[in-house]
Amino acid sequence: MELVFQWEENPQTAEQVFSLGQKAVALDDSQPTAHETLAYAYLGKKQHAQAIAEAERALSLDPNFADAYTTLADILSFAGRPEEAIRLVETAMRLNPCYPASYLWSLGHAYRLAGRYEEAIAALKRVLTRNPDHLTAHVLLAALYSGLGREAEARAEAAEILRVSPNYSLAVVRQRMPYQDPAELERILDGLRQAGLK
């Protein structure tokens, strides 16, 4: 996921990961982790169909690969298919009951896109219980609270965003969030703008 949101400072990193993922798949097409890595690399390039195909290939190679379920869920969420994403994250959580906070983020993101806002807030708060500095959990919460008219909470989340990443801005969100539907990206940006992010 760090690749998708380009948290790495070096802009060549995303291209290197993409290139290495392609090489890994070319060397051994039977490795599910290679396909999962390549799926995220395609998502980072906003090539949703290719990302879905690679994540599905990872799961066909290892149907018990819990992380690949959340990878596919993230891709489907960004592609506008949140209900499918929710089911996939639930499957991942059954396969890996000691799941990381990233699974909760994937669930919260999908809930938000499905219009299940209170469930999204609950999942994202659980992410922050595990990792108070989880940047994109704060981002989604700020946008959610703004959309629900909960201005004080939205502004508090915007302050947390800037605490975690002082240079974070709407321009960063526009560049890094790989939504297939431009209107969805605009909804996030509007919510963050209302929360006070510039």
Task: Label every PLM stretch briefly.
Residues 7-23, 44-57, 78-91, 114-126, ...:
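Structural signature of tandem alpha-helical TPR/SEL1-like repeats
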Residues 31, 65, 99-100, 134, ...:
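Residue-level recognition of tetratricopeptide repeat
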Residues 25-26, 57-60, 91-94, 128-129, ...:
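Conserved structural position within tetratricopeptide repeats
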